[in-house]
Amino acid sequence: MNARRRLWSVLMLILAVGTAATLTIMALRHNLTYLYMPSEVLRGDTAQQTHFRLGGIVEKGSFQRTSGTLNTRFIVTDGNARLQVRYARILPDLFREGQAIVATGQMQHGTFIAENILARHNETYTPRQLANKMQPTPTQHTHLDTPIAETTP
């Protein structure tokens, strides 16, 4: 009888740990928000994600504000692609054209609708995830057979 009780306790413990692990994984999956660059969004890499973070540089000369409202529009670029962003809240004080941002939101009819915007806090800082994704990518040149890394200003 003692062996049967021990077996029952072990099975219940395994069931409880399995249930807790499953619930934790499901909660994490539901709450994860991935970071994508404009070129990845336009390529369709976000098909599984309805809510994600968009990272890039605010294109100079693209910022527009509707007078008398908080509604703003601007272009975010990664040097390869451009994506229009709409935002209807107070912008961070450090928001500037030509600066890196990370916006959280979702796509609607080809425009990224931002719910939250984070601007970098000084001229030398770029969020690690954004910096990693904006590394120069090798490109093919017509007069060369080997890829050359190009950087965009």
From Swiss-Prot:
It holds the Pfam family CcmE. InterPro entries: CcmE, CcmE-like_sf, NA-bd_OB-fold. This is Cytochrome c-type biogenesis protein CcmE. Residues 1-6 are cytoplasmic. Its main location: membrane. Residues 131-153 are annotated as: Disordered. SUPFAM superfamilies: Heme chaperone CcmE. One of its GO terms (cellular component) is plasma membrane. The chain crosses the membrane at residues 7-27. GO terms for biological process: cytochrome complex assembly. GO terms for molecular function: heme binding; metal ion binding.
